[in-house]
Design a protein with these regions (language model features):
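Catalytic or ion-translocation cores adjacent to nucleophile or general acid/base/metal-coordination motifs
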Residues: 73-88, 359-372
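Polyanion/phosphate-binding surface patch
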Residues: 54, 69, 256-257
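Cysteine-centered functional microenvironments
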Residues: 138-143, 320-324
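Glycine-rich, flexible loop motifs
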Residues: 1-53, 80-139, 230, 245
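C-terminal auxiliary extensions adjacent to catalytic cores
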Residues: 2-34, 38, 42-45, 50, ...
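Acidic, glycine-rich active-site loops and adjacent beta-strand->loop/helix elements
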Residues: 63, 89-90, 109-110, 130, ...
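FAD-binding core of FAD-dependent oxidoreductases
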Residues: 57-79, 86-111, 139-161, 176, ...
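Mid-sequence acidic-hydrophobic segments that form the walls
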Residues: 86, 106-110, 125-136, 141, ...
């Protein structure tokens, strides 16, 4: 039976969002009378404020620079519908199913903070979309990250009123048709509900949750690959000695060194004379590269999770003090900072693995391993092993590195210069995912190469099998899915299979 995540009953974590995205947990909305009163009190206060004095942005006025347009009361109900319609201009690929679930979960949780002036009924229908896996088709391109993710989130807002297409049971269908089939009633917006859904950071925040989770595993896997290559290269295990890292006590640096050290079985390694007293930087300094993620992870998590558990639309409706605040909480600067930082660290890990890959296939540096790790028992001149794969690794790494320019510096004035400073957080998050995709490809290739190198050393009796004691699970997992490379063959499918296993966090780290 699946664990249940209850929205409205405490704070969500990155792990909660990822679990919802992957359908590893069930989702419920807090149904207590107290929570329902908390949410509905915001919508009721907004109605009262509207009746008393009017003049509420996005309710009685146009949007953005058009806020000087004051609407007659008979147009109030049509305004939010128009908002969803004219923002239906996104382009690019649609977000995948996992990311779409994450977007809905994040927006649901931010609206559940009780400062958005929405009804409990709105939260309920978004929950029903999640529970029934009704997934709005949300284009990835078109958000500048302030006012939030207006265009992407318009596809969620439009879907709950029956005006957008969704994916349901693998088919593209009208949301109205799917809701009728399931006995659901399309939502009827109250005054601020469309802008409450749209004017926030849920798309970039959801992508950030997915990116953080992938980067965390990739960092762990990079430590494991480094340990495998250190053994295969007959490297100096004492580059990762605990006492050494007490002299420079960055916690993440020490943690990375420990993860590498734990793979090396130092009880055996201490009796092995390394080929050189000092290995190249791509081995010796690996903890200093990978450890940057561990040292920054708490800060990145804080940025992502505070945003996740905040009200981030405009205006903020506070029924508790009976105030309506016009501000800029839709600005995605914190997520942009997190993603600009994370993509830089991930790309550096790819660059590290690229250097390790280049070293282990090159007979000038790989300490008597065969050229390109060709595993044939006879002549090496026909077989070229991982030669082309290493070229691919260079290409993937270069592509990842060129995406590390921070997106925040590309802010553009837009929307009649009302949105004259914007975050670009959504593009930063999407860039981070692309950097992760490329870096995972680098890791897949390097993992296979490191396992091949270890196998060759073992077959030649050049290393003791006990050296692999702490790496055996990962080593066995590789060869359970990957036939050793003895003669040249196409490796594309092997790489794709390994990539999917990495993304499912299959390998022991």
């Amino acid at each position: 039976m699946l664990k249940t995540v209850v929205i409205g009953n405490g704070k969500l974590t990155i792990e909660d969002v990822v679990a919802i995205a992957k359908k590893q947990v069930a989702v419920e909305l807090d149904c207590s009378a107290e929570f329902q009163r908390k949410i509905d009190s915001g919508a009721e206060f907004l109605d009262e404020a509207l009746a008393e004095h009017g003049g509420i942005y996005g309710v009685t006025t146009g949007y953005g620079d058009s806020c000087t347009q004051v609407l007659p009361p008979e147009h109030y109900s049509q305004l939010p519908i128009n908002l969803t319609r004219f923002h239906g201009c996104g382009l690019g690929d649609y977000f995948d199913a996992e990311t779409t679930r994450a977007i809905m979960a994040v927006r649901l949780n931010t609206l559940a903070q009780g400062f958005s002036g929405v009804s409990y009924a709105l939260l309920k229908i978004i929950t029903q979309f999640l529970q029934n896996d009704i997934l709005p088709l949300i284009p990835q391109e078109g958000s500048v990250g302030a006012s939030g993710d207006l265009t992407p989130l318009s596809y969620l807002a439009g879907a709950v009123i029956g005006e957008r297409d969704v994916m349901y049971k693998g088919e593209r269908r009208s949301s109205l048709e799917v809701m009728k089939e399931l006995g659901m009633t399309p939502h009827k917006f109250r005054p601020k509900e469309a802008i409450a859904i749209m004017n926030g950071t849920a798309a970039m925040n959801a992508v950030a949750c997915m990116a953080y989770s992938r980067a965390e595993y990739l960092s762990d896997l990079a430590c494991r690959i480094t340990a495998m290559i250190t053994v295969a290269m007959k490297g100096n295990a004492y580059h990762y000695y605990e006492r050494l890292f007490e002299a420079k006590p960055h916690p993440g640096l020490g943690l990375s060194a420990k993860k590498i050290r734990d793979g090396l079985n130092l009880e055996v390694a201490k009796n092995v004379v390394p080929e050189k007293i000092q290995d190249p930087y791509s081995l010796r300094c690996a903890p200093h590269v990978i450890g940057l993620f561990y040292d920054s992870s708490a800060f990145l998590r804080q940025l992502i999770e505070i945003e996740l558990n905040s009200a981030n639309d405009n205006p903020i409706v506070d029924p508790f003090t009976r105030n309506i605040f016009h501000g800029g909480h839709f600005y995605g600067g914190h997520i942009c900072l997190a993603m600009d930082t994370l993509k830089n660290m991930v790309a550096n890990i790819a660059d590290l693995l690229d250097r390790q890959m280049a070293m282990i296939v090159d007979i000038k540096f790989n300490r008597n391993l065969p050229p390109n790790l060709a595993g044939s028992k006879g002549d090496y001149d026909i077989n070229h092993g991982f030669k082309a794969v290493q070229i691919g690794v260079s290409a993937w790494t270069a592509e990842a590195l060129h995406l590390t320019m921070p997106m925040s510096v590309f802010s553009r004035s837009t929307e009649c210069h009302n949105q004259d400073k914007v975050s670009m957080g959504t593009i930063a998050a999407r860039d981070c995912i692309r950097v992760l995709e490329l870096s995972e490809q680098v890791a897949a290739a390097t993992l296979l190469a490191s396992a091949q190198a270890l196998r060759i050393r073992l077959e030649r009796d050049e290393i003791d099998v006990d050296r692999l004691k702490n790496l055996k699970e990962t080593y066995d997992q590789v060869f359970a899915k990957f036939a050793p490379l003895e003669c040249d063959r196409q490796l594309e499918q092997d790489l794709r299979n390994t990539l999917e296993l990495i993304r499912s966090k299959y390998y022991a780290v």
